[in-house]
């Protein structure tokens, strides 16, 4: 890819040079030797405020500038990239238009257009804070895009640069001699092209990409559509204009100081902060693998303070910066439908949450993370994003739940880490990644338990890089497509009339032993809906059709029995009971999904579905279990929709038109890789891109009964249901069971509720009495064990094996029953391990340290533990308990 020749810049007197520091080519108007970008040159804009504008004002100035120059303003897309098979998060404005618009397959929503797109990018997450605002995990990419096709030329390189130049000089007020244009190559989302990066004051404030290639097998292939792909950093431009000490001061303003007060962090002297921020450009070297400690040392030398003083004053503020950024990102992600989990975009949300909790822990703050995330939603809802206000309750609940889950992970972590340490001796980076990926244990927790562990400065970036993109499932390739192409595509009668169950068709031929017809009403397997079955009849012969499958534009029919010859006309019958049941269940799936979204919240998304004849299932994303009351409301709403007998329409729409009309909830069933979408709309209630067969009105579904809601994996709930006649049959069976139970109990059906409540109360009392008796028996057992002590040196040692009560209850009893100086070891089997408690009863401090003794000995045995001088708690593998007790006796003899 060659350099860029820009006639506009030549005409303004710019010349092309090569930077002696970074080796990159750039365009400059004056006698400049370097490219002007940090770290080749330091930041010069800090302390030189040009305009005291807010983020909202800068955004509006930009959009209005381009509107006045023929661009159509369009609304932002979600930060969760539901329309992409290869990405989880919207990381740039061009992501909104890839791959179909950039490939010229579908038209853009406007051409040219302008947008300010919130983006989430986690590849630099460990640099957020230390680089003072240069790196952010959430930012707004202001952009203007033009899509040049063979039929329509909009503008290209010169006009793009001219538009930036005019905006920079007339709106931002930057003298043109202060602007340099640095050349580069951009790649992203499967596309590439040369770019220019305008630099001013040491800061890159935009990227102008001339996308003209698609990347295939590592090679650049020219595109039919040439795309102007620009990105103007809203936060960077605001920082540049205001000249504030850091980008966080410019972006967050009063909210920054509010967070500092909440978190107990004082702002350092602003002159020190400004000087550090100016030289913080050297932290770009983090990208080359240098450690933050070595760069901090260099920065301290440059501004004339000690490394210790700089660390003490700057590090807490950097932590506040990180929390500001992360909680804003979380509020947008959750508002746009993210549910934290261990997979996909949910994993990335959880990564942000756990990194934030780690930072709060380092600060020693007890402020709930949920409080900070909610405050961000409140703040930004009044700054151009009113949709965040509707999500405040959900943000608070989700983050609170995740905080509790993190605490649980930490509590479980000691054993996991101890086991791994025993196996490996010293933990590697791969071990740290595994502990985080599989168990949610951050390096800080690992270090707390395992001691000295080498943690890379970019640990969370390494984690994010593994999960930020996904490889789409490769389409199943039918190996005999060349044979199929010899025949005309199959006419799909099931789309013309889903109730067509009998038809005539001509046999065109066979591929792979499967029949090709000129037309068919047999629905092929796809989208969670099984294929139709039925029969073919010709010349008095009848054979079974046991399946149908679609490859490209052709339907192949699997037939059992004699095969009619090519050219024969067959009479086909689709199994009506199966077809109609599947139609009802498929439309019911759409109804239940929308009902769940309306009851539980807009974060609910279809994870998977399977439509059956008697029973179907729908898997949805949700951050906690579904209560019986919520399930009842979902079921009631679904049946109300059935009773309203709403029309179900099928439309074929160009992708961009469908997205404009219905939004991205179209893709509940997954991304549909087609330029024209088949949209199934339950009028005024729900619309989805869907290729399945459906009823024409919701009343045809019949009753909907949801039988079960259960968690099948982290963040996913499975709803199992029946519709129509199968639902009625299940209800009848259910009622019969109630009758049978009532008859067995000798009561009426109406008395069942009262009868079983009484039984449960009685059972509760019996269990309570049983626990009391077991406790008394255990107390007597402990008393006997304490009487039968053994002497170990100058100590009395009593060993108590607990049977029916837990270790904590045993500690209370042992402490109460010990009347003299006694070392008491309590053991309680738990799976393949034994829980331990070591008590030094009636000892004075400094005589025996039970906590230290238990911790030391249990670690030697592959366990772990700790405590204070009076009490230690821990565990060891069951097969090493006797060894533990033997070593304990020897140690006590020496104390």
Curated annotation (Swiss-Prot):
Function of the molecule: Catalyzes the attachment of alanine to tRNA(Ala) in a two-step reaction: alanine is first activated by ATP to form Ala-AMP and then transferred to the acceptor end of tRNA(Ala). Also edits incorrectly charged Ser-tRNA(Ala) and Gly-tRNA(Ala) via its editing domain.
Name used for this protein in its record: Alanine--tRNA ligase
Highest rank taxon of the organism: Archaea
UniProt entry tagged with the keyword Protein biosynthesis: yes
Annotated Zn(2+) binding sites: 586, 590, 690, 694
Domain comment in the entry: Consists of three domains; the N-terminal catalytic domain, the editing domain and the C-terminal C-Ala domain. The editing domain removes incorrectly charged amino acids, while the C-Ala domain, along with tRNA(Ala), serves as a bridge to cooperatively bring together the editing and aminoacylation centers thus stimulating deacylation of misacylated tRNAs.
A single BP term in Gene Ontology: alanyl-tRNA aminoacylation
Subcellular location: Cytoplasm
PROSITE patterns according to UniProt: AA_TRNA_LIGASE_II_ALA
One Gene Ontology term, aspect cellular component: cytoplasm
SUPFAM superfamilies (UniProt xref): Class II aaRS and biotin synthetases (SSF55681), Putative anticodon-binding domain of alanyl-tRNA synthetase (AlaRS) (SSF101353), ThrRS/AlaRS common domain (SSF55186), Translation proteins (SSF50447)
Catalysed reactions, as listed in the record: tRNA(Ala) + L-alanine + ATP = L-alanyl-tRNA(Ala) + AMP + diphosphate
Molecular-function GO term, any one: alanine-tRNA ligase activity
Enzyme Commission (EC) number: 6.1.1.7
Annotated coiled-coil segments of the chain: none
Keywords: Aminoacyl-tRNA synthetase, ATP-binding, Cytoplasm, Ligase, Metal-binding, Nucleotide-binding, Protein biosynthesis, RNA-binding, tRNA-binding, Zinc
Note on how the cofactor is bound: Binds 1 zinc ion per subunit.
Family affiliation: Belongs to the class-II aminoacyl-tRNA synthetase family.
Cofactor(s) named in the record: Zn(2+)
InterPro entries registered for this protein in UniProt: aa-tRNA-synth_II/BPL/LPL, Ala-tRNA-lgiase_IIc, Ala-tRNA-ligase_IIc_anticod-bd, Ala-tRNA-synth_IIc_core, Ala-tRNA-synth_IIc_N, Ala-tRNA_lgiase_arc, Ala-tRNA_ligase, Thr/Ala-tRNA-synth_IIc_edit
Major subcellular site: cytoplasm
């Amino acid at each position: 890819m060659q350099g860029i020749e820009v006639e506009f810049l030549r005409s303004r007197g710019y010349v092309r040079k090569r930077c002696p520091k970074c080796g990159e080519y750039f365009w400059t108007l004056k006698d400049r030797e370097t490219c002007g970008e940090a770290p080749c040159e330091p930041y010069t804009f800090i302390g030189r405020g040009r305009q005291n504008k807010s983020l909202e004002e800068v955004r509006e100035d930009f959009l209005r500038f381009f509107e006045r120059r023929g661009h159509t303003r369009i609304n932002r897309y979600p930060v969760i990239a539901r329309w992409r098979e290869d990405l989880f998060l919207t990381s740039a404005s061009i992501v909104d238009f890839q791959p179909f618009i950039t490939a010229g397959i579908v038209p853009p929503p406007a051409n040219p257009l302008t947008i300010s797109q919130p983006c989430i990018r986690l590849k630099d997450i460990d640099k957020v804070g230390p680089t003072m605002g240069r790196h952010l995990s959430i930012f707004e990419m202001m952009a203007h895009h033009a899509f040049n096709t063979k039929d329509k030329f909009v503008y290209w390189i010169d006009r793009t640069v001219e538009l930036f130049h005019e905006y920079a000089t007339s709106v931002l007020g930057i003298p043109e001699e202060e602007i340099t244009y640095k050349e580069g190559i951009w790649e992203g989302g499967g596309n590439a092209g040369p770019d220019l990066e305008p630099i001013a004051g040491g800061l890159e404030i935009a990227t102008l990409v001339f996308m003209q290639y698609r990347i295939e097998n590592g090679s650049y292939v020219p595109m039919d559509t040439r795309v102007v792909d620009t990105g103007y950093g809203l936060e960077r431009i605001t920082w540049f204009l205001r000249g504030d000490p850091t980008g966080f001061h410019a972006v967050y303003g009063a909210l920054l100081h509010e967070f500092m007060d909440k978190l107990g962090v004082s702002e350092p002297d602003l002159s020190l902060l400004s000087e550090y921020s100016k030289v913080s450009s050297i932290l770009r070297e983090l990208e080359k693998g240098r450690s933050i400690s070595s760069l901090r040392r260099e920065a301290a030398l440059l501004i004339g303070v000690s490394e210790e003083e700089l660390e003490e004053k700057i590090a807490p503020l950097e932590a506040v910066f990180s929390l500001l950024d992360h909680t804003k990102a979380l509020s947008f992600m959750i508002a746009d439908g993210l549910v934290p989990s261990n997979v996909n975009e949910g994993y990335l949300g959880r990564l942000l949450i756990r990194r934030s909790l780690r930072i709060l822990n380092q600060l020693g703050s007890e402020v709930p993370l949920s409080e900070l995330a909610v405050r961000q939603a409140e703040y930004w809802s009044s700054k151009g994003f009113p949709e965040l206000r509707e999500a405040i309750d959900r943000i608070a609940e989700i983050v609170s739940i995740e905080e509790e889950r993190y605490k649980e992970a930490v509590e479980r972590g000691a054993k996991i880490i101890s086991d791994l340490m025993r196996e490996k001796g010293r933990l590697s980076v791969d071990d740290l990644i595994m502990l985080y990926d599989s168990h949610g244990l951050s390096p800080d927790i690992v270090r707390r338990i395992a001691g000295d562990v080498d943690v890379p400065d970019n640990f969370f970036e390494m984690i994010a890089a593994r999960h930020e993109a996904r490889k789409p499932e490769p389409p199943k390739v039918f190996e005999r497509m060349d044979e199929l192409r010899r025949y005309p595509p199959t006419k799909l009668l099931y789309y013309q009339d889903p109730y067509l169950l009998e038809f005539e068709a001509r046999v065109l031929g066979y591929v792979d032993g499967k029949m090709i017809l000129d037309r068919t009403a047999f629905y092929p397997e796809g989208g969670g809906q099984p294929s139709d079955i039925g029969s073919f009849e010709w010349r008095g012969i009848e054979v079974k059709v046991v399946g149908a499958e679609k490859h490209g534009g052709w339907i192949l029919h699997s037939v059992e029995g004699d095969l009619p010859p090519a050219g024969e006309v067959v009479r086909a019958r689709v199994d009506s009971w199966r077809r109609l049941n599947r139609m009802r269940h498929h439309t019911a799936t759409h109804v239940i999904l929308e009902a769940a979204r309306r009851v539980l919240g807009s974060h609910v998304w279809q994870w998977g579905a399977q439509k059956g004849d008697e029973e179907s299932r729908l898997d949805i994303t949700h951050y906690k279990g579904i209560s019986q009351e919520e399930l009842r409301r979902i079921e009631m709403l679904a049946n109300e929709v059935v009773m309203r007998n709403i029309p179900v329409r099928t439309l074929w729409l160009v992708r961009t038109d469908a997205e404009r009309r219905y939004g991205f909830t179209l893709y509940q069933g997954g991304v549909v890789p087609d330029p024209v979408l088949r949209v199934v709309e339950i009028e005024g209630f729900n619309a989805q891109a869907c290729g399945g067969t459906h009823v024409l009105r919701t009343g045809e579904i019949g009753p909907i009964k949801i039988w079960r809601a259960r968690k099948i994996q982290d963040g996913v709930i499975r709803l199992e249901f029946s519709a129509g006649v199968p639902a009625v049959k299940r209800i009848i069976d259910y009622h019969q069971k109630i009758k049978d139970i009532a008859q067995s109990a000798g009561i009426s059906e109406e008395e069942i509720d009262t009868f079983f409540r009484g039984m449960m109360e009685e059972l509760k009392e019996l269990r309570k009495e049983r626990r009391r008796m077991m406790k008394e028996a255990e107390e007597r057992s402990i008393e006997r064990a304490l009487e039968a002590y053994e002497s170990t040196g100058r100590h009395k040692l009593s060993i108590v094996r607990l049977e029916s009560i837990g270790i904590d209850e045993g500690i209370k009893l042992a402490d109460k029953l010990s009347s003299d100086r006694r070392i008491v070891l309590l053991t309680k089997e738990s799976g393949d391990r034994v829980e331990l408690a070591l008590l030094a009863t009636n000892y004075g401090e400094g005589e025996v340290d039970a906590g230290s003794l238990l911790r030391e000995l249990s670690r030697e045995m592959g366990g772990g533990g700790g405590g204070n001088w009076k009490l230690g708690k821990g565990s060891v593998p069951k097969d090493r308990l006797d060894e533990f007790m033997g070593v304990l006796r020897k140690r006590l003899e020496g104390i």
